[in-house]
Amino acid sequence: MEVFDVTIVGGGPAGLYSAFYSGLREMKTKIIDYQAELGGKVHIYPEKVIWDIGGLTPMSGENVIKQMVEQAMTFDPTVVLNEKVESIDKNEMGLFQLHTASGEIHYSKTIIVAVGGGILHPKRLNLEGAEKYEVTNLNYKITSLQRYKDKRVIISGGGNSAVDWANELVDIAKSVYLTYRKDVLSGHEAQVTKLMKSSAECYFNCSITKLISENNQSIEHVELTNHESGDILALPIDEVIINHGYDRDIDLLDNSPSLGVEIKDGYFVAGSPNSESSVPGIYAAGDILHHEGKLHLIAGAFQDAANAVNQAKKYIDPMANNFAMVSSHNEMFKERNEKLKASAAASV
């Protein structure tokens, strides 16, 4: 039975920084993530530019993920991907047991819950046979804007993301259509105004009711039905983007009643500014954590993560320092710093 000092559930910004900081505190660390790759929700908007991380110049979500993952791997944590933690309990030895969907049990002295808004599943288009087009031109997220260059694109949805993507694609795609089941878009006002002034065509009170394909491989026409008038319109398209929101899998703590973790608003971990939960040894970081003054930014997730790790360290060893030594004066980085200096000198 292999036991870890800390197991981090979730591989987004909060989980990744938790992994780095726990390594800095010389803790044996494991990350378990449901997704096939680390990075969390940032994967939903890889080409979006992120401005609000302190000390970083504006960069794409994709590059932010790359840097966060690289930092998280500094101290070689164990990483388990494509694995869902379904419940947590505690054994007679006082160790936390994380039960996963595959049947594995992971053992840990402490746990940091960093699952953000939960496991996100995009809401699928509710049309029979639609799933077969997901390998060709039915999309639930945008990973590359250039994929849509000079194409006819229809976006279904009226929220912030749908409106935002429509605005992004107007200058790239050949034509952009947006269809929404209501008569008023619910995105941010400035973005809605921008869209309405653009060349995009909007179809209100309409839904996609049929996908038409002669080759049975890719969608060639989309049938829209107006719920008010009953009118039906067939649009020739090259790409379909569905943005109907996400279903959240938030069952982890609900499935762990024996722990008694206090929950806020049916989902969030009711915690402290130090990232403590109501249960000693269990901590939370990122969007899953709730307390007065909580900052819902990536920058805030980093502070949550450091606080959670420090509390976990003290839980394991009450005599440990409250904080890690800062990296600029930490001997753990001496060899790494020398390599960086040598590399910089060689490149001159």
UniProtKB/Swiss-Prot annotation:
Disulfide bonds: none annotated. FAD binds at D33, K41, Y45, V85, L120, D287, S328. The keyword Flavoprotein applies. Its EC number is 1.18.1.2. Its cofactor is FAD. One of its GO terms (molecular function) is ferredoxin-NADP+ reductase activity. Pfam families: Pyr_redox_2. Keywords: FAD, Flavoprotein, NADP, Oxidoreductase. It catalyses: 2 reduced [2Fe-2S]-[ferredoxin] + NADP(+) + H(+) = 2 oxidized [2Fe-2S]-[ferredoxin] + NADPH. InterPro entries: FAD/NAD-bd_sf, FAD/NAD-binding_dom, Fd--NADP_Rdtase_type_2, Ferredoxin-NADP_redctase_2. Binds 1 FAD per subunit. Homodimer. Belongs to the ferredoxin--NADP reductase type 2 family. This is Ferredoxin--NADP reductase 1. It comes from Oceanobacillus iheyensis (strain DSM 14371 / CIP 107618 / JCM 11309 / KCTC 3954 / HTE831).
